Amino acid sequence: MMISCTRTAILPLRRRLMTASTAYPIKFASSIIPGYGRGSADLGIPTANIPIDDVPVLDALDTGIYYGLVQILKTDKPSEKKTSEFQKDRVVDFQYTNKLNDQEINAVLPMVMSVGWNPFYKNDQKSAEIHIIHKFAHTFYGASIKVMVLGYLRPEKNFTSLEALVDEIHNDIKVSEEKMEGTREKKDQFWQ
């Protein structure tokens, strides 16, 4: 697994948290795992969840909302059923990239990412959830991805209602799109 950061000597990260003023971009590769199933079901905002323990730079980041770019890599594996890490009674169909179209595979797409505890839902595990700003017809659990975090939008916070949470996420998406308009990072060697 490749992890990169523009800071020098990033390890050990856990004692030296990376903050909103961290040097960007932060680049890493990972795979998509099932989460709690709330992004699509409760919020109407599907997320690609990343195993935070496998990407030390994510665990070292301040909790909050980040923006950047993501690329879903072609994953040649047959579909299979697996149990969700977050909900042991939930069996998920791992499609990898089998049902994605050619324009979605390897495309560099904008994203917003939540890193934290999701106080509205009172999570007991820290998570990293990426909302890719694109409408997908199918899921792609198990797919490999590359992620480039370009900046920090805001700290993690609690909300008084589900509607307030959804409104804030939509605002995060809007701000993220504005910040990334015309970004040259889409042509970075990282995506090759």
Curated annotation (Swiss-Prot):
The active site is at E129 (nucleophile). GO terms for biological process: FMN biosynthetic process; riboflavin biosynthetic process; riboflavin metabolic process. Keywords: ATP-binding, Flavoprotein, FMN, Kinase, Magnesium, Metal-binding, Nucleotide-binding, Transferase, Zinc. Zinc or magnesium. One of its GO terms (cellular component) is mitochondrion. Pathway: Cofactor biosynthesis; FMN biosynthesis; FMN from riboflavin (ATP route): step 1/1. Mg(2+) binds at T47, N49. GO terms for molecular function: ATP binding; metal ion binding; riboflavin kinase activity. Its cofactor is Zn(2+); Mg(2+). The keyword Transferase applies. SUPFAM superfamilies: Riboflavin kinase-like. Coiled coil: none annotated. It holds the Pfam family Flavokinase. Its EC number is 2.7.1.26. It catalyses: riboflavin + ATP = FMN + ADP + H(+). PANTHER family: RIBOFLAVIN KINASE, RIBOFLAVIN KINASE/FMN ADENYLYLTRANSFERASE. Belongs to the flavokinase family. Catalyzes the phosphorylation of riboflavin (vitamin B2) to form flavin mononucleotide (FMN) coenzyme. This is Riboflavin kinase. The gene is FMN1.
